[in-house]
Amino acid sequence: MKCFAAVGRSDVEDETAVHRHSLRKFQLWAGWDEIHDFILDDVALIDLVKLQKCLRAELTIQFCFQIIQKIHGNIIALERLKTAKKGTYLGPLRLLALEVYEKMHDCGVPSTMLTGQECIADDDSRITASTIEMADFSEEYDIAVIDEAQLTADPDRGHCWTKAILGLKAHEIHVCMSPAAESAVTHLIHLCGDSLAICRYQRKTALICEDTPFSFPESVLPGDALVVFSKKSVLDVAGRLEEEGIKASVIYGSLPPEIRRRQMQLFTSGKTKVVVATDAIGMGLNLPVRRIVFVQTQKFDGTTRRGLTVPEVKQIAGRAGRFELFDTGYVNAMGQESLDYIREQLTQEEEPIEKVSLGFPQILLDLDEPLDVIIKVWKSVEPTPPFEKVRVDEILSLYAQAERYRNDIYGFDDKRILYRMISCPIDIKDHQVVLQWLRYCKDYPADKRLKHPDKGAGSKLGLQKYETYYRKLDLYYQFSHRFDKIIDEDWLEQERSRTEGTIMQYLSKGKKSYIARCQRCVRMLPVGYPFKICDPCFRHSSIID
């Protein structure tokens, strides 16, 4: 395989300077109506164009059936990564980065794990395993692995995969994904002029959809993963299992990564017989699951409650029958109608992914207009297919929060500082975390260190309170890192450890209080029931109304 010649840093800087000059020149005569075309023609792909100049010799594209994380293709990619003098793994989850780090470490390969929340580094590290957002485009690698690349279409994070596929400087890149992403990802690679080899792998274990619908709790067996689509539903089902004397691990999106890992270890070691999870289980978590049971077949996607799509069903169902542990994986659902729906989805071909997410081009920050205006104008632009712009609603929401205190925020009028603030990844639905973020926006110039977050009194109790506090600890680390503040590493490690221990206590001491009950009559609701009021109470209220 031939080595590539990377373009020098000065070339990139020169090109950026040319575009900045054209931006300023453009502003002398163009109104905001005309800027749409300018963004499309000259700016929208500027970051990608710069990255395209770093050409690679060859890419190995691995298209794997249904779930890609632990089957043959991914194993080959990681085996190749072990041989690299300098290599990197990029994936969607901190847990996946940790898993790769531990595999390399256990094989005697000095490695580093790098995420937005922490860094663990061995001496003389050769391999960096990180979340996709932490990709380093200034480094030159022998081998790189980009995992779950079908997420190029994700409206929130997809631009990170787009940038990595186009911009990583490596002699050999393994891109692992589902078959549905083939057209979109190969289009990106052809933009660079890179050569590629496509390797397709099939699932090694059979996947069987059972004939008889699952009945709760009678049908529960060791090795089952019961899938629902909200944290409340996870704790509800786990509480019902507890009443039946069945110990269960729980996995959901807002659970801190270390707690997820501990819950997984309980299941893997056999200390819990069942796992109850949201669709977070579908994203590469390596668990000894014999059977996936869809307790729910509908999810709320932020806008509407809808049925699961073909890719969602296949991604989750594919967790059943772990390679080299079970010969066969099984899938089931509650009720005949739900089982028929899941069976139908499993037989359908996935629709090809046709969109590729495009990130906000920071070159636009040089425009002499307020930041929110620039972002809103960019948001209104329709890019050339297959590109689709990343969602910017959350950063606009944070901008609105910060604008209320603009006189108290040093650097508010500096668009690059402000963009660094509002693009900090936080849970904007957690009011306490947003308040902590605002405090950091106001206070960050005052000292070399940020103030430690507090647990807060508030109205939150128990588990929710400590999950929020953990998110505040993550924010402390991320904001400190973004603004080059000194991080109190010892304190942070101790606080994380204490908080993780407290959350584990809440999850282990009893979940019966989380069982869903009707808000009117307080009777226990049916398993997987999506509403807060039972049918009899709803019908009664309808008659009265």
PLM segments and residue spans:
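Non-catalytic terminal extensions of ATP-dependent helicases
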Residues: 1-71, 360-545
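Conserved helicase ATPase core of P-loop NTP-dependent helicases/translocases
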Residues: 113, 119-122, 236, 247-250, ...
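Inter-Walker segment of RecA-like/P-loop motor cores
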Residues: 104-140
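Post-DEXD/H (motif II) to motif III coupling segment of the RecA-like Helicase ATP-binding lobe
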Residues: 150-202
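Conserved interdomain hinge at the start of the Helicase C-terminal
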Residues: 76, 81, 160, 202-240
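Conserved two-lobed SF2 helicase motor
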Residues: 123-138, 267-286
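Conserved segment of the helicase C-terminal RecA-like domain
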Residues: 178-181, 287, 291-347
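Conserved strand-helix element at the start of the C-terminal RecA-like helicase core
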Residues: 86-97, 174-176, 182, 219-244, ...
